[in-house]
Design a protein with these regions (language model features):
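N-terminal small-residue-enriched
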Residues: 1-299
Length: 299
């Protein structure tokens, strides 16, 4: 954090409570356009040589950089730098007239170097191709209730939508969340511990400070199945007689802050991956989700 004082001495010097996560380096200016184009061409060539079934390859390289200045009451001024880069790969394959597409993306709050590392972009292409190729022989599952085992990674979108949004403070203050009166009560299995952690280096949701100047932190939401609390911005925390958890997020300077997630995820449990599969006599193993929405009132 870069911090300065104006007019009044602040009650709390937030610059001493956490470490600045990112340097003031703009990834957009560090690699010339020609080098980016050469990388995309190399990825395209690699993907098309994987198999004769590959018919189309799409690769995008995205970069964003923000310099944040937050001026709070009392003359407190906070600065932060926020880089963000990402690569998305899409591969389409065709067999006997049937076309399927697979996709994979990766990135984070760092410079472009990790996206340019051969092992990283090859891993992305391989994932996209394998996903598309497997879908060529995929069969429809029977309708009805099914036991579902979720794989790591993107299936976490289900946790994000069905649980994460329901634990954002404003929805609970307004009593529109299914969790609003369940703090201290059991809401999940003993194996379930969920946190919101905005301090993990280089992750998309990780920020030195939130959009109100409050340092990001690791917030326990559900511990061994017991609901411990919610995510708060400053206003919602004040209205609920709580403390801000560093979750004040705003779409832009022209929007008011709201309590929203940073990196929300479930901690590892005591069971190995193979145990979960073995314990399910019949069901679905879901490894990829494309998105979704949920009614937080009903869950």
């Amino acid at each position: 954090i870069s911090y300065s004082k104006h007019k009044m001495v602040p009650k709390k010097d937030y610059s001493k409570t956490n470490k600045k996560l990112y340097k003031a380096s703009n990834p957009l200016h560090l690699i010339v356009l020609k080098k980016k184009i050469r990388l995309l061409e190399e990825i395209n060539d690699y993907a098309r040589k994987l198999d004769l079934s590959v018919k189309q390859v799409s690769v995008s390289l995205n970069g964003n950089f923000q310099n944040i200045e937050i001026i709070k009451e009392g003359g407190n001024v906070f600065y932060d730098s926020r880089p963000l880069v990402r690569m998305n790969v899409s591969v389409s394959v065709e067999k006997k007239g049937k076309i399927e597409t697979g996709s994979y993306g990766f990135g984070g709050r760092h410079m472009y170097e990790k996206l340019f590392e051969t092992k990283n972009w090859k891993n992305a292409v391989d994932h996209a191709f394998n996903q598309a190729y497997k879908k060529l022989s995929a069969k429809e599952i029977p309708a009805g209730e099914q036991t579902v085992v979720l794989g790591p990674g993107w299936p976490g979108i289900l946790l994000h939508e069905a649980i994460g949004h329901g634990l954002e403070g404003d929805f609970n203050r307004k009593k529109t969340s299914a969790f609003y009166d369940l703090v201290g009560k059991k809401v999940a299995s003993d194996q379930v511990t969920i946190v919101d952690d905005g301090t993990i280096p280089e992750r998309r949701g990780s920020l030195t400070i939130d959009d109100e100047g409050t340092p990001s932190q690791n917030t326990m939401l559900i511990e061994k199945g017991i609901l411990k609390g919610f995510m708060h911005d400053r206003l919602n925390a004040k209205l609920m007689n709580k403390t801000s958890t560093g979750n004040g997020r705003r779409q832009s300077y022209s929007h008011i802050p709201m309590p929203r997630m940073t990196n929300t995820y479930m901690l590892s449990g005591n069971h190995e991956h193979e145990e979960l599969i073995k314990s399910t006599k019949k069901g679905i193993y879901a490894t990829q989700f494309s998105g979704g929405q949920v009614d937080i009132t009903s869950g």
